[in-house]
Amino acid sequence: MTNIRKTHPLLKIVNNAFIDLPAPSNISSWWNFGSLLGICLILQILTGLFLAMHYTADTTTAFSSVTHICRDVNYGWIIRYMHANGASMFFICLFMHVGRGLYYGSYAYTETWNIGVILLFATMATAFMGYVLPWGQMSFWGATVITNLLSAIPYIGTNLVEWIWGGFSVDKATLTRFFAFHFIFPFIIAALAMVHLLFLHETGSNNPTGISSDADKIPFHPYYTIKDILGVLLLILALMTLVLFSPDLLGDPDNYPPANPLNTPPHIKPEWYFLFAYAILRSIPNKLGGVLALVLSILILILMPLLHTSKQRSMMFRPISQCLFWILVADLLTLTWIGGQPVEHPYIIIGQLASIMYFLLILVLMPTASTIENNLLKW
């Protein structure tokens, strides 16, 4: 008799996605981040659910309710810090996952890639709204500054911002709706992730060489299930080390005082994982220009399949492109550092140069390098 996992309508979907899935025999640890992102999402939904049981989305009690969670709720402190640092681990995995896609040409699967970019946007929106919820100083001012960017949109900007705020400033209505959205978005992300997988399984996984692996497939289970479990253990080890030894390492001390609309913090900055985009935003001395650059810094990923000029899919055998890729990584790290610095000399000019370099690398230098490499193949 055929195994139930191959016949049952629901189980066979799971079977075809995680058990009998034909996978390339040579995918490296860079292919672990997809499953790690799934684990991060589940962890965030679970910890978030327990936090929501004790949190109150009201300007007068939000900050106190978070304090109450940490002091009075059984293991509330660990749930809170797992959620906060879980977001950091989520973004580390996201950046690694996207970087892998760029390096090995995974963006050639356009549907999968585009859903991935939408997932990135959705995750960034969710994290931003989550940061507002504790209602500390940086929560309030971060929300004020970022939502205010929409006022740069011609004609409808001001109305749009006041519509999002639900008033004339960030206040109770804003906090309540941000909580509602922050709660629903992870489920939308989960649904999109399933669509992401659906499209991926139409083509099968890419591999480090970028060459078709149809001639050499192995079953996902047990080979990659055991490999994924190792990745998950390392992820949990890193997360719990952070949570138990240095839970506030990645946070901003300015978010410890409760929100005060009458007192602006000296340096308004977002969480570390948004700093690269924040640096690009600040490097343009024009409001609308900065907003456009901010959006384009992520939206540019959509263009990757169009910017691919190489005859080879992966960068594995393309040393010039490899060099430029790692320069891009260094550039993003520079932008991340600049985003956390005050707006003064020499940080302003460094940020502007790094921003120009970012767009130049992706739009001009990398496609040019690919064309040069194509010509070198003829020698």
Curated annotation (Swiss-Prot):
Keywords: Electron transport, Heme, Iron, Membrane, Metal-binding, Mitochondrion, Mitochondrion inner membrane, Respiratory chain, Transmembrane, Transmembrane helix, Transport, Ubiquinone. The chain crosses the membrane at residues 33-53, 77-98, 113-133, 178-198, 226-246, 288-308, 320-340, 347-367. CDD domains: cytochrome_b_C (cd00290), Cytochrome_b_N (cd00284). Heme b b562 binds at H83, H182. Binds 2 heme b groups non-covalently. Component of the ubiquinol-cytochrome c reductase complex (complex III or cytochrome b-c1 complex) that is part of the mitochondrial respiratory chain. The b-c1 complex mediates electron transfer from ubiquinol to cytochrome c. Contributes to the generation of a proton gradient across the mitochondrial membrane that is then used for ATP synthesis. The keyword Transmembrane helix applies. The keyword Transmembrane applies. Belongs to the cytochrome b family. One of its GO terms (molecular function) is ubiquinol-cytochrome-c reductase activity. This is Cytochrome b. It is a multi-pass membrane protein. GO terms for biological process: mitochondrial electron transport, ubiquinol to cytochrome c. Heme b b566 binds at H97, H196. A ubiquinone binds at H201. Its cofactor is heme b. The cytochrome bc1 complex contains 11 subunits: 3 respiratory subunits (MT-CYB, CYC1 and UQCRFS1), 2 core proteins (UQCRC1 and UQCRC2) and 6 low-molecular weight proteins (UQCRH/QCR6, UQCRB/QCR7, UQCRQ/QCR8, UQCR10/QCR9, UQCR11/QCR10 and a cleavage product of UQCRFS1). This cytochrome bc1 complex then forms a dimer.
